[in-house]
Amino acid sequence: MASNSEKNPLLSDEKPKSTEENKSSKPESASGSSTSSAMPGLNFNAFDFSNMASILNDPSIREMAEQIAKDPAFNQLAEQLQRSIPNAGQEGGFPNFDPQQYVNTMQQVMHNPEFKTMAEKLGTALVQDPQMSPFLDAFSNPETAEHFTERMARMKEDPELKPILDEIDAGGPSAMMKYWNDPEVLKKLGEAMGMPVAGLPDQTVSAEPEVAEEGEEEESIVHQTASLGDVEGLKAALASGGNKDEEDSEGRTALHFACGYGELKCAQVLIDAGASVNAVDKNKNTPLHYAAGYGRKECVSLLLENGAAVTLQNLDEKTPIDVAKLNSQLEVVKLLEKDAFL
């Protein structure tokens, strides 16, 4: 699988920005520069919705969307759509699809003047915005669609996110508008979809291995299985001679990937196999830096239980605690500080 060999922004001399700036459209590194060194896989993070968010936050589009969300007639149409597929939201249920009712309702939606105006304006903005081009291209990629489906399935099993997704399913446009204005929810959704965080490289990984282009490295099976949470595949790779501490071109080991993604079982398998918990990548980030920055609390606990150092600094002189603070991972900060003072 191809990897991004661009210069890692952690080496930048720029000063850190504020927390609010770190939530802007481009993820910030520990030194305040844009993240450019991506984990193996897609160079463009198809799950970073920040560009689309900026378009949807356009005052005129937001005003129209809010009007539609509050429009009783439009909400009635949304209810009709839900009734046309009555079992769609039930776990394990097969939809009882009423095609005629669905088509009739969609025709009414499309003839709603406000909806048509908003859709046309939004469509024009999306097509004309150069920053949205890679987003649209990525979602036409079958690998991205498969990865999206996989992440959505995980989100529906997440105890924190499941109630939110259920409410959006049940509440329609009004529920969507409610959560679109909630930065904490957007942050959780972004983390669940693998969006990058401040202080660390982009985490995006494609669901299937790509053919390595000339001059680019191919991702090892150990790295790939650890990234995707394939426990049995990882065990098989190690049993067949895979190197538990193999490094990619950026110096990252399988444990870096497993901890960055929160793949606890894979991290445990690697540690049981003797993987170094204090391995450093080319920017001196340890697996604990990754787990802390991405808020993977269980992986942080596992690493600490197995002797991971809390005080090691990366090239930007940031400890795992610093990276956790930079990304507002408060529960992780408490855990790390407790260990540091033992």
From Swiss-Prot:
Changing P113L: In akr2a-3; small plants with small and curled rosette leaves, as well as delayed flowering, especially in chilling temperature conditions. ANK repeats lie at residues 217-246, 250-279, 283-312, 316-342. Its main location: cytoplasm. It is a peripheral membrane protein. Changing E246A: Reduced binding to monogalactosyldiacylglycerol (MGDG) and phosphatidylglycerol (PG). Disruption phenotype: Lethal chlorotic phenotype when homozygote. Reduced levels of chloroplast proteins, including outer envelope membrane (OEM) proteins. Defective chloroplast biogenesis. Reduced APX3 levels and reduced targeting of APX3 to peroxisomes. Compromised peroxisomal function leading to increased sensitivity to aminotriazole during seed germination and shorter hypocotyls in darkness in the absence of sucrose. InterPro entries: Ankyrin_rpt, Ankyrin_rpt-contain_sf, STI1/HOP_DP. The keyword Disulfide bond does not apply. Gene3D superfamilies: 1.10.260.100, Ankyrin repeat-containing domain (1.25.40.20). Keywords: ANK repeat, Chaperone, Chloroplast, Cytoplasm, Lipid-binding, Membrane, Nucleus, Plastid, Plastid outer membrane, Repeat. Changing R296A: Reduced binding to phosphatidylglycerol (PG). A 1,2-diacyl-3-O-(beta-D-galactosyl)-sn-glycerol binds at H223, E246. GO terms for molecular function: chloroplast targeting sequence binding; glycolipid binding. One of its GO terms (cellular component) is cytoplasm. Interacts with TOM20-4, CYTB5-E, CBR1, APX3, APX5, TOC34 and GRF6. Binds to chloroplast outer envelope membrane (OEM) protein targeting signals, as well as to chloroplasts. Interacts with OEP7. Binds to HSP17.8 via its ankyrin repeats, this interaction enhances chaperone activity and chloroplast binding. Also interacts with HSP17.4A, HSP17.6A and HSP18.1. Binds specifically to two chloroplast glycolipids, monogalactosyldiacylglycerol (MGDG) and phosphatidylglycerol (PG). This is Ankyrin repeat domain-containing protein 2A.
